[in-house]
Amino acid sequence: MKSNANQIHTHISASHKWFDLKLDEVWRYRDLIILFTKRSFAVSYKQTILGPLWLFINPFLTSIVYIILFGNIAKLSTDGLPQILFYLASNALWSLFSVCLTNNASTFTGNAGLFGKIYFPRLTVPISNVFTAIIRFGITMSMVLVILAFYCITGAVTPNWIYWLLIPFILIWIGALGMECGIIISSMTTKYRDLSVLVSFGVSLWMYATPVVYPLSQLPEGMLKTIIEINPVSAPIELFRFAVLGKGTIVPWSIALSAGFTAIVGLLAIVVFNKVERSFIDTV
């Protein structure tokens, strides 16, 4: 009888290491992450007429609404940038964060049936949600790049090309922050279902406390501007616009604060995730 030397054996035991993410195990299940990513992307546009075209239509129509409401009616400045480009780029990165947060906010409650049937590293689900959000972001950004090329040719926009090297780090930064917040919320919703109702409302409010529809440079000095700068999502949004569009306010202490906040929330998310994944199936 021949034995399969490449067969993977998974040993399941009680873990008492609060900061152990079992990343080696997650790596062994990387094919499952790819499968979850494909499934999530496919399900999003299943039984729709236009399918993934909504990734172009939705942000474009949203930007048109922003132009009418915030540009023409509220007369908010876009830092001298073309309005359509300002809103499209800002909304693309914000959508990456909000999708990572909202999709991961239902990690435990939305996958309870699957988690209860078979064992696999639970972390594969939130990671796949981030990958799905990044794919959506990439598709939307292809439209932004076409419009950006037009305005670069006309001389209306001059990107800071060297800062484009930071874009992958910005995506990891804001994707990780969204995933961490989502995991913490998901852990809490296993006992308090009311929180799931408040997530979309809270994310909407959070957007207006973030320089998405307005540039940070247009805010007057004072408490309001300081609060916006403390917002951990503000720094990556402004840094992203500075790189891609050539206009953005870089506040070093705000960047450091946001990076530190992301690290601390990440540690908290690990502890909460490891604690809840052991017993959540009995409470969901």
Predicted segments, located by residue:
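Hydrophobic transmembrane alpha-helices and immediately adjacent juxtamembrane helices
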Residues: M1-V284
